[in-house]
């Protein structure tokens, strides 16, 4: 569904809308329940990441407070970020990690064809989890050397240390490849 002037529920597709607190906007929840009842849907399985699991939690709690027991809400975790609590490897992470590793291996080949010194910085998705950025070292599995530096959002980032490290590496080689987590913050 998408929130425009009023909520419009679609029968397929994706959703990037966070449900509001039911005390503020119970209409959203009632619209979902009406839709499920209209099509005789008694089990709602929502596949996704943190925001999707938040929706599952809110809808499930709302159904419980209303005493609605004929509709079941199930959350199936899937996120490339690999940051869902209670899971070791989230569905979606493995293929994304492989893609990141392959991309860095190919990027390395591209970076080393020139004699000119260059620094390539790649920001890797993952919000507040550095799993995908760490997966950039999978480039090594196929004979590449992988990124020269990997900066994870879980580790404090110092711009001074970063610049010193890059400068030193550029004195050793012509190309420097860096993987940086999307959630890295300057300290």
Go through the PLM ranges and name each one.
Residues 10-18, 78-88, 115-118:
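Gly-rich Lys/Arg/Thr-decorated short loops/hinges at beta-loop-alpha junctions or inter-strand turns
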Residues 42:
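Short acidic/polar active-site loop segments enriched in Thr and Asp
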Residues 35, 46-48, 54-66, 70, ...:
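Accessory alpha-helical/coil subdomains and C-terminal extensions
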Residues 6, 10-30:
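Phosphate/nucleotide-donor binding subsite
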Residues 28-39:
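Short, well-structured alpha-helical segments in soluble
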Residues 6, 75-79, 95-101:
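Catalytic or ion-translocation cores adjacent to nucleophile or general acid/base/metal-coordination motifs
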Residues 1-9, 187:
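Single conserved hydrophobic/aromatic residue that forms the stacking wall/gate
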């Amino acid at each position: 569904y998408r929130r425009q002037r009023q909520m419009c529920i679609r029968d397929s597709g994706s959703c990037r809308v966070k449900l509001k607190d039911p005390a503020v906007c119970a209409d959203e929840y009632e619209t979902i329940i009406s839709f499920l009842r209209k099509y005789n849907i008694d089990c709602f399985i929502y596949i996704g990441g943190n925001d999707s699991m938040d929706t599952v939690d809110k809808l499930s709690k709302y159904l419980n407070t209303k005493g609605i027991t004929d509709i079941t809400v199930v959350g199936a975790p899937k996120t490339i970020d690999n940051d869902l609590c209670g899971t070791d490897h989230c569905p979606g992470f493995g293929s994304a990690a492989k893609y990141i590793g392959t991309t860095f291996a190919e990027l390395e080949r591209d970076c080393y064809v020139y004699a000119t010194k260059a620094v390539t910085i790649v920001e890797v998705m993952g919000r507040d989890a550095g799993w995908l950025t760490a997966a950039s070292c999978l480039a090594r599995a196929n004979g590449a050397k992988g990124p020269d530096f990997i900066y994870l959002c879980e580790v404090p980032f110092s711009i001074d240390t970063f610049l010193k490290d890059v400068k030193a590496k550029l004195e050793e080689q012509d190309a420097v490849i860096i993987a940086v987590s999307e959630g890295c913050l300057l300290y």
